[in-house]
Amino acid sequence: MPLFLLPNNDLVDKIIIDGNKKTKENVIRREILHPIGQPLDSLILNEDINRLYNLGIFSTVDIQFKNNTYQVDLVESFSIIPDLVIDYSEITKKWSYGFGLAHINFFGLNQQLYLGGAFIGEKWFVISLNNPWIYGDHVSFNTVLYNRFSDNPFYDYRFNATYFLVETGFYNGLNNKFEFGLSYYKNKKHTRGDVPQNEQDIYRYLNLEFNYQYDTRDVYKDPLKGSLFGINTRYSKSLINNNSDISQLSFSLQNFFLLKFKYLHEPVFSYGIYGLFKFPKFLKLPIHEYEYLGGEDFVRGYSSFPNEYPDGFEKNIEVSNIIYNYLELQSTILKKKDYGKIEFGIDGVLFINSGIGSKAIKQFSFDNLLIGYGFGFKFFITGPPPISIMFGFNPYGQKYTHLSN
């Protein structure tokens, strides 16, 4: 009995890419994992969309299956983005102004080149180049040169800090990322006031860093689901004999869940935990290694300044060890939309966060627990991370506004 083979209209026969006027085609094809000659898999199709969008160089990514063709349609974002630096520091309580340029698709290879700085207020400049996939399987290269000239807001001195980093990394599978960095850091005081007795006028370190990241988020900038786990270690070898070497260990975990609630658009619940531990003891650390538990980086709803904290908490704010966690509910207010190569959208956020700080690992205590809560907004623009403004409150009647990106 003869066997008749009928054509399979669900097979992917070819992949066509359209819209990449500047981006090299191999940059796009290496992100597409749907096999040719296999039936269409809608799950892989959605994952391919997310991988291309996560490159950060397209304002629109769409994949359609028509006539056995895997049709990839792209809208490239502007490659060169001017950066008007208008920044307010909660710590220095100063505005800074400057200008920069970001090339987010250098040579069409998804390389990010940035050059810019602030020239009024807190003065700094930075130049960086990042190639997330320079050769092989996700072998990356990143370099940063940074200089900052500023006043320390907590102690009476002015300093100049210089940082230079060379970093490379690779992937193991799609979710496991490893990075290795070698950097140089110098911190020199130009004026000296009332500082701790052991504080030196100059510090120089050679830093060895290692980062591991496990990432299953669907969209990096605004996840609907997935997890992000990371570990960072750093060993700083002092290049000056009378200064101590410094070791640092940190970890973080974030989880995202898309909820079903008819009164909100794409509501996402997330929670996270972060731990930071430094050695040697607090009294042997230089001032630039001190951490401050309140403010935009950790517990929102509090100041970064110890003297602005509620009575009884001052000594537990300027610390070297931190355990921090948060709960957030985020929902779309203005759906992200392509406005001619620039994507823009707004989300609303409700949050509760808490943290404990200590000067030694053995001194962690729930008696020092800080709790903050509030609401805010995230503004999504193609290219940079989202800009957020958060209005934080605490149980002691204080309120603070936190602006960050």
Please report, for each region that a protein language model flagged, where it lies by residue.
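Short basic (Lys/Arg) and small-residue
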Residues: 353
